[in-house]
């Protein structure tokens, strides 16, 4: 609670009792108007002028280095661009818990609400011109008139064309800066009533101004460059993104086509519950886009018909919604299509309405001051010459960009004149310097980033694809001005070996002091596995290149040894593994007698290792098949293993382990083992029969995604899968229960599965450590009295009450917080890489099963899989799906430096063998056996050359691992003799 002195000072300053507004700099914070996963948006106003603004409050506690990179991307983009159809960034602030973006306030909501409300948004009313047919429109209860839209279907054609033209202007401007938005959707297209100046300059009267917002996913992407991350909203995603393929700026054109379809029809072109189903529907359409009026015409229905979509808009939508990017309309053709010609400026001709209007409701017009001003402005604009201005791509704000703006040269190519560049909005007068900086030390003054020399630019480690040679953008553009940051002199870490560093927007943190005593496994981490900086020290994705153009720099691009983009989990692998497991399940015969041993160092069958998830009863009618599709990018929801109830339904579907819960949580599954014990919880973690495995029955739709997990994988199994699943299962009994080829296969696959399993367990431990550190950071950074539903703004009273203690411990507490964040990121990095290595072993094993199955089905018609082979396939499928989801979630918490923690696996093997020895001394022989086995599996995984980036293990490491395995094997053999003797005595 605020103390009396603070309360009294606030009352004195405010001038009235119990009246206080939260403030951020020179801005007063008002009511909440929006909320997302990582940010809350509030409406506010300038304290002196009372001009409305929007304040986007982003919680620093939720920001991993990846999310911070997205935020810095948005900040740096908005700071250097100035366009009437792009939401403006006014100012930036930060405190210990939040980063605040003060942005232009758009009072007309967004396009999705506009479509849903048919334009009836309170702030978008207008007064028709004198003598216009719109003056005959009916008014609402408050005497307001809104733009007339059809009662169903899409928007009025004139509004659709105007909105499309405004969106095209924004996209053309972004193209001039080599920017792609990557998340164009109706929710990110904000609306604002046209100002007097905009109406005077020719903006269509009564039609709102459209502004593109939310650049959190935007990135620099030259014309020929390709991206490969999953960003954006599924319903408006291009199919190449849904297929996890590389994509270029043409992905934005698909999104534009989807938005245009929704404006014209009233709904998205494709709808589905998840992106796998969405991709299936897009592929099924085969580029055949059918509009509602065409369906009604073909069916010759006598019911009420839909509003027809103009033919030129239909043609444009079909040209944009092409599945293959090469077949999709290009930017030049899009800008020259002419669909919005005549609808970007006010027409002097009389409007013609296609709707029936009443003639008795013109009263109540012009009641508000704003409406009267609009009428006056319209009358004055009749005799006013519409000014023309050179386009200004960059803000002329001296505080944000001290250098003079350089206008973009006009494009002189044929046909480009159709898309007129709108005049820049008036530059606001800034009376204060920018407040944004992410570093923890307040700088004395802002400094400009100096463009790096060519020699300082990071060199990619891999040669570029010849087919993807970067070309100069055909659109002429000015050199952007330097981005201003308060800590621009700081250096960014490099993820590769050596001491090379990149420029950063943040300052280096002070020396770090651990917040608590005691050894930590991450403190002894070699330098090659640690990011030399806080997660808050991620460099902004936009920097200045040697030629003055905007560039995107990433630690991964300069890495020589990190995992980086070589490991991209793809949906196609998930589909193939699930499909093959389903086929094996369908083609299995009655259970066989399992061979007792394959001569391996391990006695436990691999089938006993079930997924670490609660068992789900197969006969439970309230549970349904849960998709194992990877979670959408930037999702903070971890892959929980929880039962998801549903209504009972028919069919032959069997439940799978759930993947994503209905409730959101920022932490990964609670089923992760909290300790590496092998005693009492062994029975709970390790199943005892194949029946405990979850079997799936829904084969996934096969996509055309390029496989990037461990290189290219054979796709020849697809034909065999389709052929085998189409046959009836014949009643064939195998002559012999022993198949030498299958026995060799299972021996090899089991060894791979064991390696995958132990790496998965170790990854779970690291992910658990990450969540515990996250909880520690959340607890330590939440001040008393500021929890619960308190808005995330700095409260003067609480700050005054705690000022003394803060001044004494601010340095140590900040260092502790940064230390926790670094350890949290390091744990997530380890988890991601270990999950990926585990997935690599699983995929390798499944490929062997796939090749074996194809050979058998090609030679023997109606070949029946053994129960053992089916059991192995189900285990691999279940483990792949669980590992896949956890890797996707851990990736959102990880940083840029992703190196294989071989030292961690080695230390884990040694510790586990020690624990096993202690258990043996205490007489717990079963637990000791499991510990020795696990230790050997870990060392065998280290001896597998496939886990290393260069494909070979260092000789000295191989010798060390072999030397360590000898005594463990000796102990295991002796222990098994004891177990055999004890079992023999028990039998007697």
Swiss-Prot record:
One Pfam entry name: ATG1-like_MIT1
Pro residues biased stretches: 449-463
Biased composition (Polar residues): 468-478
Mode of membrane association: Peripheral membrane protein
Name of this protein: Serine/threonine-protein kinase ATG1
Domain of life of the source: Eukaryota
Active site: 183
Record's keyword terms, sorted: ATP-binding, Autophagy, Cytoplasm, Kinase, Membrane, Nucleotide-binding, Protein transport, Serine/threonine-protein kinase, Transferase, Transport
Biological role: Serine/threonine protein kinase involved in the cytoplasm to vacuole transport (Cvt) and found to be essential in autophagy, where it is required for the formation of autophagosomes. Involved in the clearance of protein aggregates which cannot be efficiently cleared by the proteasome. Required for selective autophagic degradation of the nucleus (nucleophagy) as well as for mitophagy which contributes to regulate mitochondrial quantity and quality by eliminating the mitochondria to a basal level to fulfill cellular energy requirements and preventing excess ROS production.
A GO molecular-function annotation: protein serine kinase activity
Gene Ontology CC annotations of this record: autophagosome; cytoplasm; cytosol; phagophore assembly site; phagophore assembly site membrane
Top-level class of the enzyme under EC nomenclature: transferase
Residue segments, region Disordered: 1-21, 394-561
Biased composition (Low complexity): 418-431
Gene3D superfamilies named in the record: Phosphorylase Kinase, domain 1 (3.30.200.20), Transferase(Phosphotransferase) domain 1 (1.10.510.10)
Subcellular localization: Cytoplasm; Preautophagosomal structure membrane
SUPFAM superfamilies: Protein kinase-like (PK-like) (SSF56112)
Chief site of localization: cytoplasm
Amino acids binding ATP: 33-41, 56
Annotated S-S bridges: none
GO biological process: autophagosome assembly; mitophagy; piecemeal microautophagy of the nucleus; protein transport; regulation of autophagy; response to starvation; reticulophagy
Sequence ranges assigned to domain Protein kinase in this UniProt record: 27-346
Subunit structure: Homodimer. Forms a ternary complex with ATG13 and ATG17.
Gene that specifies this protein: ATG1
């Amino acid at each position: 609670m605020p103390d009396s002195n603070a309360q009294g000072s606030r009352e004195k300053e405010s001038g009235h009792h119990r009246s206080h507004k939260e403030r951020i700099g020179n801005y007063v914070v008002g009511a909440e108007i929006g909320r997302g996963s990582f940010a809350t948006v509030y409406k506010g106003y300038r304290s002196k002028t009372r001009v409305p603004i929007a304040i986007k409050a982003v919680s620093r506690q939720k920001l991993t280095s990846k999310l911070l990179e997205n935020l810095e991307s948005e900040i740096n983009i908005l700071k250097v661009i100035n366009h009437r159809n792009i939401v403006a960034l006014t100012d930036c602030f930060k405190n210990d818990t939040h980063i605040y973006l003060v942005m232009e306030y758009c009072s007309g909501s967004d396009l999705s609400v506009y479509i849903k409300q048919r334009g009836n948004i309170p702030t978008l009313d207008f007064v028709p011109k004198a003598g216009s047919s719109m003056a005959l429109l009916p008014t609402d209860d408050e005497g307001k008139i809104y733009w007339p839209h059809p009662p169903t279907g899409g928007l009025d054609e004139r509004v659709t064309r105007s909105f499309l033209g405004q969106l095209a202007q924004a996209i053309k401007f972004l193209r001039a800066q080599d920017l792609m938005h990557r998340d164009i959707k109706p929710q990110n297209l904000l609306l604002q009533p046209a100002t007097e100046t905009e109406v005077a300059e020719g903006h269509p009267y009564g039609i709102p101004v459209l502004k593109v917002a939310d650049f959190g996913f935007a990135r620099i992407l030259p014309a020929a460059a390709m991206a490969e991350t999953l960003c954006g909203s599924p319903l408006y995603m291009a199919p190449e993104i849904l297929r996890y393929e590389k994509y270029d700026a043409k992905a934005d054109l698909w999104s534009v086509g989807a938005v245009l379809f929704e404006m014209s029809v009233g709904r998205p072109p494709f709808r589905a519950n998840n992106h796998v189903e969405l991709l299936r529907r897009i592929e099924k359409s085969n580029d055949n886009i059918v509009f509602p009026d065409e369906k009604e015409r073909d069916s010759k229905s006598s019911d009420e018909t839909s509003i027809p979509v103009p033919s030129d808009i239909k043609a444009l939508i079909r040209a944009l919604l092409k599945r293959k990017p090469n077949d999709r309309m290009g930017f030049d053709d899009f800008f020259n299509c002419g669909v919005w010609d005549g609808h970007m400026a006010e027409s002097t001709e009389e409007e013609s309405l296609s709707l029936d209007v009443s003639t008795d409701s013109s009263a109540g017009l012009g009641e508000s001051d704003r409406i009267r001003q609009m009428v006056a402005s319209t009358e004055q604009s009749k005799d006013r010459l519409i000014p023309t201005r050179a386009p200004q791509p960059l803000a002329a704000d001296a505080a944000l960009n001290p250098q003079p703006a350089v206008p973009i040269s006009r494009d002189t190519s044929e046909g480009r004149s159709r898309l007129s560049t709108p005049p820049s909005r008036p530059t606001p007068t800034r009376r204060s310097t920018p407040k944004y900086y992410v570093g923890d030390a307040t700088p004395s003054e802002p400094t400009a980033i100096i463009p790096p020399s060519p020699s300082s630019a990071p060199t990619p480690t891999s040669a570029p694809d010849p087919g993807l040679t970067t070309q100069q953008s055909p659109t002429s553009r000015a050199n952007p001005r330097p981005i201003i940051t308060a800590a621009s002199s700081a250096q960014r870490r490099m993820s590769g070996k050596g001491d090379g560093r990149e420029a950063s927007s943040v300052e280096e943190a002070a020396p770090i002091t651990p917040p608590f005593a005691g050894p930590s496994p991450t403190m002894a981490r070699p330098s090659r596995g640690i990011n030399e900086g806080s997660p808050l020290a991620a460099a902004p994705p936009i920097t200045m290149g040697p030629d003055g153009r905007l560039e995107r720099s990433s630690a991964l691009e300069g890495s020589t040894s990190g995992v980086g983009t070589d490991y991209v989990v793809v949906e196609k692998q998930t589909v193939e593994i699930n499909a093959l497991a389903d086929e094996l399940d369908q083609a299995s015969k009655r259970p066989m007698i399992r061979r007792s041993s394959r001569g391996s160092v391990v006695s436990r069958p691999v089938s006993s290792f079930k997924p670490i998830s609660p068992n789900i009863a197969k006969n439970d009618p309230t549970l349904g098949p849960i998709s194992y599709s990877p979670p959408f990018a930037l999702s903070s929801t971890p892959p929980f293993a929880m039962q998801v109830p549903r209504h009972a339904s028919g069919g032959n579907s069997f439940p799978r382990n759930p993947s994503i819960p209905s409730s959101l949580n920022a932490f990964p599954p609670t089923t992760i083992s909290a300790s590496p014990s092998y005693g009492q919880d062994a029975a709970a973690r390790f199943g005892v029969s194949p029946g405990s495995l979850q079997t799936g029955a829904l084969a996934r739709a096969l996509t055309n995604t390029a496989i990037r997990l461990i290189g290219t994988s054979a796709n020849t199994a697809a034909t065999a899968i389709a052929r085998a699943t189409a046959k009836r299962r014949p009643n064939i009994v195998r002559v012999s229960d022993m198949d030498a080829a299958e026995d060799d296969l299972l021996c090899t696959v089991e060894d791979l599965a064991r390696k995958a399993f132990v790496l998965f367990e170790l990854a779970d431990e690291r992910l658990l450590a990450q969540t515990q550190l996250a909880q520690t950071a959340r607890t330590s950074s939440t001040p008393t009295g500021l929890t619960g539903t308190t808005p995330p703004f700095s409260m003067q009273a609480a700050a005054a009450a705690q000022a003394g203690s803060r001044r004494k411990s601010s340095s140590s507490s900040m260092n502790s917080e940064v230390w926790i964040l670094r350890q949290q990121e390091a744990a997530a990095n380890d988890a991601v890489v270990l999950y990926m290595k585990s997935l690599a072993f699983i995929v390798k094993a499944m490929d062997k099963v796939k090749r074996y199955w194809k050979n058998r089905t090609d030679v023997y018609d109606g070949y029946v899989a053994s129960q053992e082979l089916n059991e192995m396939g189900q285990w691999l499928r279940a483990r792949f799906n669980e590992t896949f989801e956890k890797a996707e979630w851990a990736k959102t918490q990880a940083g840029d430096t992703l190196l294989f923690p071989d030292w961690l696996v080695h230390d884990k093997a040694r510790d586990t063998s020690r624990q096993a020895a202690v258990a043996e001394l205490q007489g717990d022989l079963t637990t000791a056996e499991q510990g020795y086995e696990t230790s050997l599996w870990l060392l065998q995984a280290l001896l597998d050359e496939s886990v290393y980036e260069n494909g070979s293990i260092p000789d000295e490491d191989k010798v060390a691992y072999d030397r360590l395995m000898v005594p463990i094997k000796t102990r295991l053999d002796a222990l098994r003799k004891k177990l055999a003797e004890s079992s023999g005595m028990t039998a007697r």
